[in-house]
């Protein structure tokens, strides 16, 4: 029952008909059964547990020596350690608090360390790209069904503001990311439109999730399934009403076309030249140029301007607090930004980059940027040599990094776990086959 239909990928010729490995079965069905985990309210904890558990089961020092991690994978491990270290310092500085310590541990497990586990797993267990692609395609095609059901519930006035699942209600702390929320009407481009977060806790997360699903499903080999999956991804993108995601998708597709035409090697130079010439002609700074598309959305979407202003205020207060402890940050969230009346929001709630500066300081920020850049280059080099999967992985990473400017990666990562699992399989498949030492015993004998 666990065997998928025959998949004949273009980039692998060996073992394509082999039965699924344990890791492939677990990942495949975990992705397929996403609606169940969503209704149970266990997604943010379940996905990290699955990937970290698989890595723990399959970890082998001999395999690590036989095919060591690329430096990009080590960089994500370094980022997770930096996060844990600064959090420990912060908790120690403020006085030990069990609830704060548990929250920091959970955040560590479901963010950067989970990303590391996703990228590292293919080095210890067989995780084929086409298996994750097929599962993601089925999940994304299912978006159409889920959105249709939520629209019907909206018109029938069923569900209301959603609910907190029983399992989620038993856990301590904030239940925001565990709540099941259904669709509601919201004006978008001046027209009442159905808006939903689907299986995620926040519309921008659904937006970037839809973009990444779209890019992954472009390599699905089953044409009918690919068409439904792409339609589902686009429907989810529209339902999210995420301004940044709506800009990210065409940008990602444009970059993919540049790879196809061989222009990408020269694109950065030409793009920079045209951008700054355009800025000088229009009398804009580069920052103002980037803000213009968002202003257009703000003028036509209800409450968008207020939302952007609140985000800017929180980021400003976050950076002001960071300056009091610039090198290692505060470790844990200790302050809130006052929005209006009795409404406050925790510092670091918007923008990955300001949040990392605030929590992990310059040390953590440099580590994060290094991990991002190294991961980008890990897929860029095979992409310019014609690797189609690495091309879309590169485009997906660019879209994700842009989305990180509005939403913390530590908040998004658990809902994007399938992308990181796919990315790890893509990076592993793109590595050259070189084996110098095959076991720890051989390594010890060479000393």
What residues fall within each predicted segment?
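Transmembrane alpha-helices of multi-pass inner-membrane enzymes
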Residues: 51-59, 393-403, 408-447
């Amino acid at each position: 029952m666990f065997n998928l239909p025959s998949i004949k990928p273009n980039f692998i010729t060996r073992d394509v008909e082999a039965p699924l490995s344990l890791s492939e079965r677990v990942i495949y069905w975990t992705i397929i059964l996403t609606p169940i985990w969503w209704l149970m309210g266990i997604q943010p904890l379940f996905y990290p547990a699955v990937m970290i558990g698989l890595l723990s089961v399959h970890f082998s020092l001999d395999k690590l020596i036989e095919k060591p991690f690329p430096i990009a994978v080590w960089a994500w491990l370094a980022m997770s350690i930096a996060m844990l270290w600064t959090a420990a310092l912060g908790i120690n500085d403020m006085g030990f608090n069990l609830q704060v310590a548990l929250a920091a541990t959970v955040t560590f497990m479901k963010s950067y360390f989970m990303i590391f586990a996703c990228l590292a797993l293919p080095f210890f267990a067989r995780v084929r790209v086409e298996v994750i692609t097929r599962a993601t395609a089925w999940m994304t095609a299912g978006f159409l069904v889920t959105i249709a059901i939520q629209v019907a519930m909206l018109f029938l006035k069923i569900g209301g503001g959603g609910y907190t699942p029983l399992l989620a209600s038993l856990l301590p702390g904030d239940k925001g990311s565990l709540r099941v929320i259904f669709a509601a009407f919201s004006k978008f481009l001046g027209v009442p439109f159905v808006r939903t977060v689907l299986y995620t806790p926040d519309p921008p997360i659904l937006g970037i999730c839809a973009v990444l699903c779209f890019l992954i499903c472009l390599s699905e080999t089953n044409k009918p399934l690919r068409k439904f999956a792409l339609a589902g991804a686009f429907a989810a993108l529209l339902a999210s009403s995420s301004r940044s995601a709506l800009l990210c998708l065409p940008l990602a597709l444009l970059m993919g076309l540049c790879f196809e035409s061989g222009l990408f090697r020269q694109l950065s130079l030409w793009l920079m030249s045209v951008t700054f010439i355009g800025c000088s002609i229009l009398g804009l700074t580069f920052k103002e140029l980037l803000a213009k598309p968002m202003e257009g959305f703000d003028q036509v979407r209800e409450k968008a301007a207020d939302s952007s202003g609140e985000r800017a205020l929180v980021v400003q207060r976050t950076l002001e607090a960071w300056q009091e402890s610039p090198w290692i940050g505060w470790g844990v969230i200790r302050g809130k930004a006052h929005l209006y009346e009795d409404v406050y929001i925790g510092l670091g709630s918007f923008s990955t980059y300001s949040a990392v500066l605030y929590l992990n300081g310059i040390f953590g920020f440099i580590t994060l940027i290094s991990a991002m850049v190294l991961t980008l280059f890990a897929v860029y080099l095979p992409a310019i040599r014609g690797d189609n999967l690495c091309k879309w992985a590169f485009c997906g990473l660019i879209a994700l990094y842009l989305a990180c400017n509005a939403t913390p990666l530590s908040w998004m990562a658990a809902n994007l776990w399938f992308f990181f699992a796919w990315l790890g399989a893509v990076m592993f498949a793109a590595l050259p086959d070189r084996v110098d030492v095959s076991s720890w015993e051989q390594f010890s004998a060479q000393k």
